[in-house]
């Protein structure tokens, strides 16, 4: 994996969007599976990556939370309910940029999305409970 080539390609994108409102920047590890990006890297790999991320001392902040997420896929709307804080948010996620990198052993996806706070009535298609690690 040529990390410098990835940084050279995504840093200008990050710099262009970092001061915009409601922006999410995400880096995902996984494998291209046809037209999908499959982030199921296996439990052992996930634990090794998470251990390495937690070890790094330079993060501005680290946060782990358990949330229930309800999705309306056709409108890209999701409700996040944080069990610890009781906070609920509803956002509409709009993809801004996706950059994919074929690497070995895992591929990398860099995403920028606009997460616009919204409200209204939506029928939710599915629910997932996630433990989220944010750095």
Indicate residue ranges for each PLM-predicted region.
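Phosphate-end processing signature that detects enzymes handling 5′-triphosphorylated RNA
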Residues: 1-135
């Amino acid at each position: 994996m040529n990390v410098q080539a990835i940084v050279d390609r995504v840093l200008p994108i990050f710099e262009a969007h970092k001061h915009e409102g409601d922006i999410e920047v995400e880096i995902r590890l996984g494998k291209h599976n046809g037209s999908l990006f499959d982030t199921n890297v296996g439990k052992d790999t996930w634990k090794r990556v998470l251990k390495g991320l937690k070890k790094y001392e330079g993060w501005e902040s680290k946060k782990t939370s358990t949330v229930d997420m309800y999705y309306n896929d056709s409108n890209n709307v999701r409700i996040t309910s944080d069990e610890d804080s009781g906070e609920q948010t509803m956002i509409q996620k709009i993809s801004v940029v996706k950059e994919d990198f074929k690497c070995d052993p895992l591929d990398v996806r860099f995403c920028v999305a606009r997460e616009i706070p919204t409200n209204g009535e939506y029928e939710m298609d599915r629910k997932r409970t996630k433990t989220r690690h944010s750095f």
